[in-house]
Amino acid sequence: MKALHFGAGNIGRGFIGKLLADAGIQLTFADVNQVVLDALNARHSYQVHVVGETEQVDTVSGVNAVSSIGDDVVDLIAQVDLVTTAVGPVVLERIAPAIAKGLVKRKEQGNESPLNIIACENMVRGTTQLKGHVMNALPEDAKAWVEEHVGFVDSAVDRIVPPSASATNDPLEVTVETFSEWIVDKTQFKGALPNIPGMELTDNLMAFVERKLFTLNTGHAITAYLGKLAGHQTIRDAILDEKIRAVVKGAMEESGAVLIKRYGFDADKHAAYIQKILGRFENPYLKDDVERVGRQPLRKLSAGDRLIKPLLGTLEYSLPHKNLIQGIAGAMHFRSEDDPQAQELAALIADKGPQAALAQISGLDANSEVVSEAVTAYKAMQ
């Protein structure tokens, strides 16, 4: 089996690429970073530090790399069995034209073996969004063929991969946590379902997408925002602060109550899942910076994302949400010189005031009780 993976960054190498290579799949990375491409093609291997209770070093071998903006990537799409991505939500649109060209070439070459494309991004139904971009880039006469022969498979991914603080200056070395979860929608595949250790197949993807979004992502973001306000540097430092931990755990329990109501998750198992996530935030090997985790607050405060979506669920089912409100207020305080969204957020609040700004970003009614609660909490943090 041959696979092409877009994105040779830390998540690409440390998570999805590693799982594919470990499964014996012939893997080629596509990226724009020439230093990483050259290193991969010189060595065809790299090291992954897997850290949890203990630390182990795994070697991923037999990999190649191509530029994601050249002809090579188009040729590969015409040949491979699987295309995966870990490029970040905003980059999906940029890689779509190359994928479209590759699919046209595949059609022209008469390659009708099934191809499945899986976007492994921190977003809800990312592959469906990628499909929209690809379809827009396709000529009309190729669209029906692509619908017939190409599966666009949505997935939920979960593994903390902090930026590498490698002492060796090795551009390929990466550190990841022991925990990993890659859940894919088995109803969307073309052809036989793949058997890849570490890839979990489900016919109820949205339950797992929301479980991860409402727990890991919600908890991670709130830890970062409250941690930064309290002057902590890392996620571990922040979650070991008892005041912050209580709010984060409370927020995950509030969002969890929505999941239990909506999808019928077992309450005891979900409580154990929350505990596992708190343990992951405490991992001493992961030097995860609160500023990195908190960045892009406008996206994280949008209606379909990790703070507002669970809040809307609590309103739908008339459930408590005081800790989620604290997290939203913390996000409104997020400031970073390196993050354009943080600067835009600050400007919006300065211009319109917190009430109108939050309503505009989140889609919540400016005159609603929850916006009033969030503004009160926001002002109390000043």
Curated annotation (Swiss-Prot):
InterPro entries: 6-PGluconate_DH-like_C_sf, 6PGD_dom2, Mannitol_1_phos_5_DH, Mannitol_DH, Mannitol_DH_C, Mannitol_DH_CS, Mannitol_DH_N, NAD(P)-bd_dom_sf
Residues the record lists as N6-acetyllysine modifications: 269
Top class in the EC scheme: oxidoreductase
GO cellular component entries: cytosol
Keywords, alphabetical: Acetylation, NAD, Oxidoreductase
Alphabetical GO biological process terms: mannitol catabolic process
Pfam family, one: Mannitol_dh
One term of GO molecular function: mannitol-1-phosphate 5-dehydrogenase activity
EC number(s) recorded for this UniProt protein: 1.1.1.17
UniProt cross-references to SUPFAM superfamilies, sorted A to Z: 6-phosphogluconate dehydrogenase C-terminal domain-like, NAD(P)-binding Rossmann-fold domains
Record keyword Calcium present: no
Family recorded in the similarity comment: Belongs to the mannitol dehydrogenase family.
NCBIfam families: PRK02318.1-2, PRK02318.1-3, PRK02318.1-4, PRK02318.2-2, PRK02318.2-5
Name listed for the protein in its UniProt record: Mannitol-1-phosphate 5-dehydrogenase
Organism (species): Shigella flexneri
Gene (name only): mtlD
